[in-house]
């Protein structure tokens, strides 16, 4: 068992060595169908859940060079570079571009986001997430959602120093999609970024080391399913 001081030291050491980005989808080039995140050079993170960067990790919204064409009911592979290093959940959200608006200028503002994927930890001597060490994630595109243009938001929350307010680290980016073959369902319970999370949410403010938690609540709404 590690003393609290040793835990903090270990977590801090890990915090400077394992940062990453979400730069591409499917077999595209880096930042081709993904909006270039502000951490594209330094692999940094967002620490303030009230910051506009919590949406797509862009202080000034700007589009990706192109759009990924996909179909409702398929999966999109979202890539982390080099891989997910820190313990914590991976989650994916989607937001549909309103009819009549341009995906290249729409920034995803307002309560427009619905969750399509989340992973969960295994409990035991320590919390372990299936995402740790992975670089690719198959994101399901719900078969019943409307056709149209969407932003697909990738998020991993590093919880290695999350025992104090503001300690959780958010690694984020947004891909641009064109979805065809969809249905007519409008997902309920949409959320806004910022707005979906509080710094004191139990899945964000948490000591994952000691005492080892026996439960974990993913931040945000439930995963939408058709």
From Swiss-Prot:
Named cofactor requirement(s): Cu(2+)
Subcellular location: Secreted
Binding of O2, residues: 160, 169
Single GO MF annotation: monooxygenase activity
GO biological process: cellulose catabolic process
Principal subcellular localization: secreted
Keywords: Carbohydrate metabolism, Cellulose degradation, Copper, Disulfide bond, Glycoprotein, Metal-binding, Monooxygenase, Oxidoreductase, Polysaccharide degradation, Secreted, Signal
Positions with a binding annotation for Cu(2+): 19, 86, 171
Catalytic activity entry: [(1->4)-beta-D-glucosyl]n+m + reduced acceptor + O2 = 4-dehydro-beta-D-glucosyl-[(1->4)-beta-D-glucosyl]n-1 + [(1->4)-beta-D-glucosyl]m + acceptor + H2O
Signal peptide, first to last residue: 1-18
Bilayer-crossing regions: none
Protein name: AA9 family lytic polysaccharide monooxygenase E
Species name: Thermothielavioides terrestris (strain ATCC 38088 / NRRL 8126) (Thielavia terrestris)
